[in-house]
Swiss-Prot record:
Protein species of origin: Methanosarcina mazei (strain ATCC BAA-159 / DSM 3647 / Goe1 / Go1 / JCM 11833 / OCM 88) (Methanosarcina frisia)
InterPro entries attached to this UniProt entry: Ribosomal_uL4, Ribosomal_uL4_dom_sf, Ribosomal_uL4_euk/arc_CS, Ribosomal_uL4_euk/arch, Ribosomall_uL4-arc
Protein name as catalogued: Large ribosomal subunit protein uL4
Keyword Transcription regulation carried by entry: no
Basic residues bias spans: 82-94
UniProt keyword terms in alphabetical order: Ribonucleoprotein, Ribosomal protein, RNA-binding, rRNA-binding
Family: Belongs to the universal ribosomal protein uL4 family.
GO cellular component: ribonucleoprotein complex; ribosome
Annotated stretches, region: Disordered: 62-107
Gene that this polypeptide is encoded by: rpl4
Length: 253
């Protein structure tokens, strides 16, 4: 069984810990992508145009015998209206608000995707491909004292000592304006993801670290494929606590 070094809050190595079998799972990018896309689809809200969009006009057709097509035309004008091919007309087949856009994933596939994404967090090649900046040796396992940090300043000091804070700065200064219409729809900026901190149980660090740029803090019970592989790309830079490693034994089977 593989082992990993454990570090304290100053970044010094203080011992070793055995890694559970979940870190030996095969890398399955196909299952990871399937699970992440399903999670994103299941968050979608119903959307569609107004029932009367493009229909608010009194345009009527001229009838036969005038040498023009039988489309509705504005009053005192020859300009077409209402029909899909006219400017300002209705959509022919608009999105339906009643459509079911949710996706289902087999339970075994979803769990396999999580196991595979967990194993990818200790692969330096995959972590580097995601663009993370780090100096620490993977996997990064911290003592349980990390879970008791109550101040964001203390978390920053730990990340600096562990050689991970550069990745938080990458996310902080990597924010940029989104291309396309989304910037008008409440999602003006695109944000990068940085460090994922996994704790064994609900503890103060869940609030202490949550306001850092790109940082997510969760317990083992809340882990999912999207947290471990944002944007379907596995290999997220992850910090585990000793208790979190212990809870992974036999999880997601």
């Amino acid at each position: 069984m593989a082992t990993a070094k454990t570090i304290d809050l100053t970044g010094r190595t203080v011992g070793e810990i055995e890694l559970p079998a979940v870190f030996d799972a095969d890398y399955r990018p196909d299952l990871i992508k399937k699970a992440v896309l399903a999670a994103q689809a299941n968050r979608l809200q119903p959307y569609g145009p107004s029932l009367y969009a493009g229909m608010k006009t009194s345009a009527t057709g001229w009838g036969s015998g005038r040498g023009v097509s039988h489309v509705p035309r504005l009053k005192n004008s020859s300009r077409a209206a209402r029909v899909p091919h006219a400017k300002g007309g209705r959509r022919a087949h608009p999105p339906k608000p009643e459509a079911d856009r949710s996706e289902k994933v087999n339970t075994k596939e979803r769990r396999y995707a999580i196991r595979s994404a967990i194993a990818a967090t200790i692969d330096p090649t995959l972590v580097n491909l995601r663009g993370h900046i780090f100096e620490a040796e993977l996997p990064i396992v911290a003592v349980n004292d990390l879970e008791n940090l109550e101040r964001t300043k203390q978390v920053i000091e730990f990340l600096e000592a562990a050689g991970l804070y550069e990745d938080v700065l990458r996310a902080k200064y990597g924010r940029h304006i989104r291309a396309g219409r989304g910037k008008l729809r409440g999602r003006k900026y695109k944000h990068k993801k940085s460090v994922l901190i996994v704790a064994g149980e609900n503890s103060p660090i869940l609030k202490a670290a949550r306001n850092l740029s790109g940082v997510d803090v969760v317990t083992v019970d809340s882990l999912n494929a999207e947290l471990l592989a944002p944007g379907t790309h596995a290999g997220r830079l992850t910090v585990w606590t000793e208790s979190a490693i212990g809870k992974l034994e036999g999880a997601f089977q």
